Design a protein with these regions (language model features):
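Aromatic/hydrophobic pocket-lining residues that form the small-molecule binding cavity
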Residues: 46-49, 73, 99
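Conserved AMP-binding/adenylate-forming
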Residues: 35-36, 52-94
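Glycine-centered loop/turn positions within well-structured domains
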Residues: 23-25, 71, 109
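Short, well-ordered coil/turn elements that cap or connect secondary structure elements
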Residues: 22, 82, 129-130
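Structural core segment of the AMP-binding/adenylate-forming
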Residues: 86-148
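N-lobe entry segment of adenylate-forming
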Residues: 1-56, 61-62, 78, 104
Length: 148
């Protein structure tokens, strides 16, 4: 893979996508071995999520990403880049006060969490932050209407 002709990771991914077989597995979860993404699925997921993000963010808006290492993390990171946002990655090991500091410091328009465990750490904080337009989650979070 030649890397000296691309300006960013998004371009690098796209150039490699054009070279690969669309139905070849590209990403695979370490926890759930049935959770895998082909090159084509990854590409289409990046496009779809970036279109959704464009409804809520403007150029250079920050998007807080709270997740463990998983295929959806990479898809989300590249989607944020495509939507012209800035990914602010956060460790999932942070506690509530760490997230509050980070949220106050970066003023994210969107927060993306991997699951209900991460959402529970921020749910009390986000109520007082009007700059947060939307909360997204990789997995379904029951008993809330705050998250899509």
């Amino acid at each position: 893979m030649e890397t000296n002709k691309q300006n960013n990771l998004l371009e690098l991914f796209y150039q490699q996508y054009l070279k690969e077989k669309p139905n070849q597995i590209f990403l695979k979860s370490l926890k759930n071995l049935n959770n895998e993404f082909t090159w084509k699925e990854t590409y289409l997921n990046i496009l779809k999520l970036s279109q959704e993000l464009n409804l809520f963010i403007e150029n250079k808006d920050r998007c807080l990403l709270i997740s463990e290492n998983r295929p959806e993390w990479m898809i989300t990171d590249l989607s944020i880049m495509l939507a012209k946002g800035i990914t602010v990655p956060a460790y999932k090991t942070y506690v509530e006060r760490d997230y509050e500091y980070l949220i106050d410091d970066c003023n994210p328009s969107i927060i993306i969490v991997s699951d209900h465990l991460q959402y529970n750490k921020i749910k009390n904080i986000i109520k007082s932050k009007p700059f947060i337009k939307k909360i997204l989650s990789f997995e379904e979070i029951k008993d809330t209407t705050d998250v899509i």
